[in-house]
């Protein structure tokens, strides 16, 4: 059986706030760790029937980028729902939410 790994290396300040987030994966095209400003990982716990989440962001990630990041995450869920369940209605509803959120952040003062 083939195996693959994803690794995260998080540098924390004295208050345990992420200063630097690095990641690497065995299937990543380039070699070595790459910096990221935020990660959001969701895991389904089959025993508890709930989702475990890990959300981290570096303290220098701009708020505007954080909002875009979460809209991108939600949009990715739309494709995941469609691919994994075939539920076109649910995928379309998620996409519509993303479109509303994009309009919302575009209308916010800079």
Language-model features, listed with the residues they occupy:
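Structured beta-strand/loop patches that form or line metal/cofactor-binding pockets in enzymes
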Residues: 1-7
């Amino acid at each position: 059986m083939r195996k693959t790994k994803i690794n995260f290396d998080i540098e924390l300040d004295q208050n345990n706030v992420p200063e630097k987030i690095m990641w690497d994966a065995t299937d990543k095209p380039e070699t070595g760790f790459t910096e990221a400003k935020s990660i959001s990982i969701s895991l389904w716990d089959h025993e508890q029937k709930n989702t475990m989440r890990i959300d981290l962001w570096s303290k220098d990630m701009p708020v505007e980028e954080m909002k875009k990041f979460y809209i991108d995450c939600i949009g990715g869920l739309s494709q995941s729902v469609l691919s994994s369940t075939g539920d076109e209605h649910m995928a379309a509803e998620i996409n519509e939410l993303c479109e509303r959120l994009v309009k919302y952040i575009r209308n916010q003062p800079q």
